[in-house]
A protein has these predicted regions:
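Structured, hydrophobic secondary-structure cores that serve as assembly/anchoring elements
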Residues: 24-312
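Long, low-complexity, polar/charged, intrinsically disordered or flexibly structured peripheral segments
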Residues: 1-22
Length: 312
């Protein structure tokens, strides 16, 4: 079943325990051309996914360069229920953390099935709407958090967090939903599950990771034409030109930090990235670096394509 959320298309699939070859449930996404966000709420409002289901969803996102929005355990009724030793680590054990983010608490909104009665719901769908709106208005590189990240359609939250409660959760990599006077419910955090202070990961922030995923997917698809081209210096120069143009357009849109293109990004594809051994194996390697808007050193991503194949 498909639903529309703003300008975005949303596919709704049952979470199935079927095997991957059956292409049922979440495995149906193997046939999807492209998706960017994944929500896997439990079947029942008060239900909870198994850890295996969370791991499957996160692994799916890693394979497809997508991002998984994780719901909190419904038993977490106050901030003190969420500590590294008190359930959080077990809750996300084995989950690929860099492509996922956890949001707390649950949201309160009208249940159309119950005639509009206000009930508690997992927040993943509401957060996905905020992220999609932020992508449309500011780009994938903009943090989907802050006063502009209002959660439309939500009446309230199950827990009203204070600044003092927000801080420790943020340090654990848990993104808080907050309620502010005159603003209402908002997303007030933009860290991945790899964003705990103790981890010091380069993928600490949601917009940095999602920008990298966007670049990887766009450049992988945008350079597939090289497969039947001679794998030599003219091809590498053409790749640098095309990828450089793509990166420059993003720079002009404000995707990167830096006053000049040199400060904002680089593209490398030459005899250093693609050795003679790579050429012999039919591979071309592209290295891209970019300066994210969050203060950090250049983030490096690598794209590998098959090249130099003679068309039969």
């Amino acid at each position: 079943m498909r639903r529309s959320s703003g300008s975005r298309s949303t596919a709704i699939l049952p979470l199935s325990t079927a095997s991957r070859p059956a292409r049922a449930g979440i495995w149906a996404l193997e046939q999807a051309y492209l998706f960017k966000l994944l929500c896997v709420p439990p079947v029942a409002r008060e239900g909870v996914l198994t850890n295996d289901a969370r791991k499957t969803a996160a692994n799916c996102c890693k394979r497809r360069r997508a991002f998984y929005i994780v719901d909190p355990d419904p038993s977490w009724n106050e901030p003190g229920d969420i500590t590294a030793d008190n359930g959080l680590n077990a809750f996300i054990a084995g989950v690929e953390r860099e492509n996922a983010a956890l949001y707390f608490p649950r949201v309160r909104m009208a249940d159309v099935v119950l005639g509009g009665a206000v009930e508690d719901f997992p927040p993943c769908g509401a957060v996905a709407g905020v992220i999609a709106r932020t992508d449309d208005m500011g780009g994938v590189w903009k943090a989907p958090a802050g006063q502009d990240a209002t959660i439309i359609g939500t009446q309230d939250l199950t827990v009203k967090l204070t600044d003092g409660e927000n801080g420790p959760l943020n340090a654990l990599g848990v993104n808080c939903l907050r309620v502010f006077p005159l603003i209402g419910p908002v997303v007030w955090g933009a860290r991945t599950l790899d964003g705990a202070d103790i981890l010091a990961s380069e993928w600490k922030y949601v917009p940095v990771r999602r920008l990298a995923l966007f670049l990887e997917e766009s450049l992988h698809r945008g350079t597939m034409w090289v497969v039947f081209e001679p794998n030599d210096a003219p091809l590498w120069a053409q790749i640098r030109l095309i990828v450089g143009t793509f990166m420059h357009n993003l720079f002009r849109q404000g995707a990167f930090q830096g006053a000049t293109p040199r400060e904002a990004y680089f593209v490398k594809c030459d005899e250093e990235t693609t050795t003679q051994t790579d050429v012999d194996n039919g591979l071309v390697n592209i290295v891209i670096g970019f300066a994210p808007l969050k203060p950090a050193e250049f983030v490096i991503i690598k794209i590998q394509q098959v090249a130099g194949q003679l068309e039969a």
